[in-house]
Amino acid sequence: MSLLTEVETPIRNEWGCRCNDSSDPLVVAASIIGILHLILWILDRLFFKCIYRFFKHGLKRGPSTEGVPESMREEYRNEQQSAVDADDGHFVSIELE
């Protein structure tokens, strides 16, 4: 019996090595799941920057404005713009001698 390959059983019980029975539905399902897992893992490693950038930044598109009146939307835009404009004067100019 080899410990590193597959489990072998005595031939006299007519079990043999059951790893070669590829017609078993469980073996077929496990093979398909294994192949799909390998493909998804390879795609994840190849495109992980694109995938995780999409989930990190792509789904954050600001607060929902559904059901909010247009006047309140305009007020919110003005507040956001005034906050951006106020930050423009906070830059420090450093001159080296």
UniProtKB/Swiss-Prot annotation:
Q: Name one GO cellular component term.
A: membrane
Glycosylated residues, per the record, are N20
Which terms does the UniProt entry file under GO BP? protein complex oligomerization; symbiont genome entry into host cell via pore formation in plasma membrane; symbiont-mediated suppression of host autophagy
Additional information = When the channel is activated, one or more imidazole moieties of His-37 probably become bi-protonated.
Quote the residue positions with lipidation, kind S-palmitoyl cysteine: C50
Residue numbers marked as site, Seems to be involved in pH gating: W41
The annotated site for Essential for channel activity, possibly by being protonated during channel activation, and by forming the channel gate and the selective filter falls at: H37
**What is the activity-regulation note?**
The M2 protein from most influenza A strains is inhibited by amantadine and rimantadine, resulting in viral uncoating incapacity. Emergence of amantadine-resistant variants is usually rapid.
By its UniProt entry, which Pfam families does this protein fall under?
Flu_M2
**Cellular localisation:** Virion membrane; Host apical cell membrane
The way it spans or sits in the membrane comes to: Single-pass type III membrane protein
- Superkingdom classification of source: Viruses
Function (record text): Forms a proton-selective ion channel that is necessary for the efficient release of the viral genome during virus entry. After attaching to the cell surface, the virion enters the cell by endocytosis. Acidification of the endosome triggers M2 ion channel activity.
What protein family is recorded? Belongs to the influenza viruses matrix protein M2 family.
Q: By what name is this protein known?
A: Matrix protein 2
Keyword annotations for this protein, in alphabetical order, are: Disulfide bond, Glycoprotein, Host cell membrane, Host membrane, Host-virus interaction, Hydrogen ion transport, Inhibition of host autophagy by virus, Ion channel, Ion transport, Lipoprotein, Membrane, Palmitate, Phosphoprotein, Signal-anchor, Transmembrane, Transmembrane helix, Transport, Viral ion channel, Virion
UniProt modified residues of type Phosphoserine: S64, S82, S93
- Whether Nuclease counts among this entry's keywords is no
Residue intervals passing through the bilayer: 23-43
Keyword presence, Transmembrane: yes
The principal location of this protein is virion
Q: How does it assemble?
A: Homotetramer; composed of two disulfide-linked dimers held together by non-covalent interactions. May interact with matrix protein 1.
Recorded source organism is Influenza A virus (strain A/Japan/305/1957 H2N2)
Any GO MF annotation of the entry:
proton transmembrane transporter activity
Intravirion topological domain residue ranges: 44-97
